[in-house]
Amino acid sequence: MRRASNGKPGKPIESIQRQLAISLSHIFRFMAIVYIVYHSGYGHTKLQAEAVHRGASLVSGIQANIRTTEEASANLDELDEADAIIFGCPTYMGNMSADMKKFIEAAASKWFTLTWKDKIAGAFTNSSSFSGDKLNTLLGLVINAMQHGMIYVGTGMLPAANRPEDMHSIAGPSPEALNRVGSFTGAMAASFQVPPPSAPVQGDIQTAEAYGKRVAEITLRWTKAKA
């Protein structure tokens, strides 16, 4: 531990060196880095996460990486290099899964130094019904991002964006409709009791792809503005 000029303890040398290395890597690299960190209990959210990853990978100038919460918890420092982190998990009993909560609590070590401050953030979730109180899960992930000082990005997509005529049907948007669940906070999917890969349906998967692409595009704009 070094001491600052005022005699008070300063940051550990190792912490300063790590931050310097990250700063230099940002100066000399030409790719913005996006991480998708997810937990999936039965495989539905895994398909959603992979779709978010595909969407982010479509953006030129983006290096997209995907990690489970277990993998990310084992190597939290890896996320320090990210320009954006997109969090995803299933909704269980109206809340985020225990595995995602465990990751969030492990990542509290980054909160003390605000290491993830000003990184872009996003979130997605899946449940077994149209509602399932999924919004509560997304809000929990949003609050986690705010605790870290991150900048959160929503879907920016109208319900049934590619099939507006579906909004005039009492049955609501079809399985092919983008944002058929109508979420502005983050990407949602409804799998009911259908096993993967039949669920999530095409519209939910394409919504996740579009969301990953949107977050990546905003991340690229943000990193260029900071350069």
Describe each PLM feature range.
Residues 10, 55, 98, 133, ...:
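Glycine-centered flexibility motif
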Residues 151-195:
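Mobile beta-alpha loop/short-helix "lid" or hinge segments that flank ligand
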